[in-house]
Amino acid sequence: MDQAYFKDYYHLEREHWWFLVRRKILAERINTLLNRPRQIHSLNVGAATGTTSDMLMEFGEVMSIEYDEECCRFTQGFLQTPIIQGSILDLPFEDNQYDLVTAFDVIEHVEDHQKAVEELWRVCKPGGHIAITVPAFQFLWGPHDEINHHFRRYTHSQLLQLLEPLKGKVIYSTYYNSFLFFPIAAFRLLVRFLHTLSGKKEQPPARSDHEVLGIHGWINRILSGIFHLDYYWLKAGLRFPAGVSLMIFFKKSD
């Protein structure tokens, strides 16, 4: 991938409704669930162009790691915290090093996701926290997943099962992006049905949801407003039984 791609993605992460509101939701959840943490040491795995790392700076020092070497080099040019290239399957850090370890929409990109969460657990301090977000429900699989090289989508029980071997406990979990769940599900299922009805064997060109829905204008504002309902719902202490995405917070045993 060239620098032009990462420049586009830089703006996408800072302007698109999904990235903007997700970041706001995550900051609020971290602040609430970790009891207004300050001066903690966080590791952000899969930092991309750094917006989640910027968000984590609110809570203390941040180390970032990104698998894509070119993306890492691009982000190093402006990120205010350290970022290095590396893999979630072999994190280049000592055991028990970080108060908070985050993997926001990362483990779905990894074939050996069990090894991935074990590495997150390994570098987390005893009594520290791991925060994970993933796309939800395999029946929502579509071109967005293919173009982003996902291996899977998750249910709540599947994510719990993945974390079960780790020593510690889940302190919080919920689906989110839920007010848009039914429209998005209907759209994806309709696209799949129409393709089947057409009788064509070849798949249409894969397009990301971010490309389909765009980042500018009234569509972005409307979808941002709807997604903000999730923010207020979760901030009020409520949870969702279904959604396009899923989040979980895990506390490592002391």
Task: Identify the role of each PLM range.
Residues 1-96, 100-104, 117, 217, ...:
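Conserved N-terminal segment of class I S-adenosyl-L-methionine
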Residues 7-13, 131-152, 156-164:
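Short, glycine-/aromatic-enriched active-site segment of Class I SAM-dependent methyltransferases
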Residues 57, 76, 111, 125, ...:
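Short conserved AdoMet
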Residues 71, 138-140, 179:
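Feature marks short, surface-exposed loop/turn motifs that line or immediately flank catalytic pockets
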Residues 104-107, 133:
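Residues lining the SAM
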Residues 114-129:
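A short glycine-rich, Lys/Arg-flanked "PGG" loop and its adjoining helix->strand segment in the class I
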Residues 168-178:
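Conserved S-adenosyl-L-methionine
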Residues 180-254:
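A C-terminal cap/extension of S-adenosyl-L-methionine-dependent methyltransferases
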